Amino acid sequence: MIRLLHLSDPHFGTEQPEVMAALLAFAAERRPDLTLLTGDITQRARAEQFRRARAFADQLPAPVLSVPGNHDLPLFNLVGRLFNPYGHYRNHISNELEPVYESSRLLVIGVNSTRPQRHKNGELSERQIERVSRLLRSARSDQLRIVIQHHPVRAIEASDKANLLINHERIVPRWIDAGMDLL
């Protein structure tokens, strides 16, 4: 059995110590094989927030595969947003914005759905969509195939529909056709 821990939107900078301690205890008890961290790791993409997130991730009992979220890009620091939008993310979390994890039973493909010119409403390029499709098609039949990204493709509440990934209605069927098991 493969055991995954999925964490999204911890928003370091607003984290509560008792919640972080409970998450670490839960992870230690469950002993996941891999942790998936799917964006909004920080509240305002500040170096100190990323340092705290890194310190937390280093305490997890499994490797961490992460993708950035819109809060992981500078919002008010326009120079940083334009010229080095992923600088703190790369310095503290991962140099890779679209990581891939593969084992004999698992393939996890990370996709960066953020755009420096936009604070919300994630988007994927045709190149990104095709890259994921190609990797999914190349997976072995006995591998669980997972795609991770920050922006949602479904909304339960009508008010959340404004936050959906742009063009999700055409992206998801392509990935399903390519063999995706979980998004």
Regions found by a protein language model. Give the residues of each.
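Active-site neighborhood of phospho(di)ester-bond hydrolases with catalytic His/Asp-centered motifs
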Residues: 7-8, 35-40, 64-70, 112, ...
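His/acidic metal-ligating clusters that form di-metal
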Residues: 28-34, 121-183
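Short, flexible segments with low predicted structural confidence
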Residues: 7, 29, 103-104, 147
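Extended active-site neighborhood of metal-dependent phosphoesterases/phosphodiesterases
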Residues: 51-134, 139-141, 170-178
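Short gly/ser/thr-rich secondary-structure transition/capping motifs
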Residues: 18, 89-93, 165
